[in-house]
């Protein structure tokens, strides 16, 4: 018994040693800033002068700030990519789940953007969507357009283009989650539905989608949090301006902009708290909707 206890203790210590670096990073760069930002939001913080307590002044400013509401609107628009991302991810998972030649290579290629820095991805796509870049070159070569389209300097196209880039990078991650689930489904269920005369669409909609429900909810929550917290693609492609003409302002970027361009750290902290509340509301709504839908295994 003593030997077993020592082995368990040793394994526990080893586990804590492996987790310690990640936990230290989380404590220093995530949890401490979150805790510090809460009282900061109620002050007029000054780097060089005195910091004054201002109560709810920063939150009152938010209500009257048109740029903040523009950022909220754009962040909510970004959330619209969540269902598109899930549909494409499920479609790709079904495609690569087939036992066809070359699917292993295809999986790697689809997953590759996930492990690539978003900053690097954004820089590459910035060149691709340039007026003299690959996309415009192909569209003009095929005769679909006569003049280059300014994807990233157009108020109407800049945000949708960034959404497309974000979808492209996230596809591989969600595809692998759905693929893992598909590969663990009992084949007897699929075979039984076929024997009962179900078409391919009926099998997909009546059998596979209910079985994928836990993964769909998980991926929807994760991608919603990611969409509301989007920052790097906006910052990189717009060179830290949120342009053209503020059209790509999102909440996370606007919080950064107030802190490091305007040096208004108290107001930035207030924006961050509101972002956290909006994210919480979205995910609570998803949870409520999921519970109303019931458990597919009931």
Segments predicted by a language model, with ranges:
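N-terminal leader/signal peptides at the extreme start of proteins
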Residues: 1-5
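A structural signal for multi-pass alpha-helical bundles of membrane permease subunits
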Residues: 7-298
């Amino acid at each position: 018994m003593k030997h077993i206890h020592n082995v368990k203790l040793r394994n526990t210590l080893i586990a804590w040693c492996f987790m310690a670096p990640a936990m230290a990073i989380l404590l220093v760069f995530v949890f401490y800033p979150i805790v510090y930002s809460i009282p900061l939001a109620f002050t007029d913080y000054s780097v060089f002068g005195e910091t004054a307590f201002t109560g709810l002044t920063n939150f009152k400013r938010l209500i009257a700030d048109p740029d903040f509401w523009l950022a909220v609107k754009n962040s909510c628009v970004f959330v619209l990519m969540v269902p598109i991302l899930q549909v494409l991810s499920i479609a790709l998972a079904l495609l690569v789940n087939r036992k066809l030649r070359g699917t292993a290579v295809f999986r790697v290629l689809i997953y590759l953007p996930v492990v690539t820095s978003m900053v690097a991805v954004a820089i590459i796509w910035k060149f691709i969507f340039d007026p003299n870049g690959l996309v415009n070159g192909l569209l003009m070569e095929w005769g679909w357009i006569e003049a280059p389209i300014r994807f990233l300097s157009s108020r109407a196209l800049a945000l949708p283009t960034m959404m497309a880039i974000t979808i492209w990078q996230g596809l591989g991650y969600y595809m692998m989650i759905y693929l893992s689930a598909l590969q663990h489904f009992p084949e007897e269920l699929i075979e039984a539905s076929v024997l009962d005369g179900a078409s391919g669409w009926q099998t997909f909609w009546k059998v596979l989608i209910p079985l994928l429900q836990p993964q769909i909810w998980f991926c929807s929550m994760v991608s919603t949090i990611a969409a509301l917290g989007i920052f790097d693609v906006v910052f990189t492609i717009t060179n830290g301006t949120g342009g053209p003409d503020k059209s790509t302002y999102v909440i996370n970027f606007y919080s950064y902009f107030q802190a490091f361009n305007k040096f208004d750290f108290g107001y930035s902290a207030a924006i961050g708290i509101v972002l956290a509340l909006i994210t919480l509301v979205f995910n609570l709504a998803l949870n409520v909707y999921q519970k109303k839908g019931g458990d597919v295994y009931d």
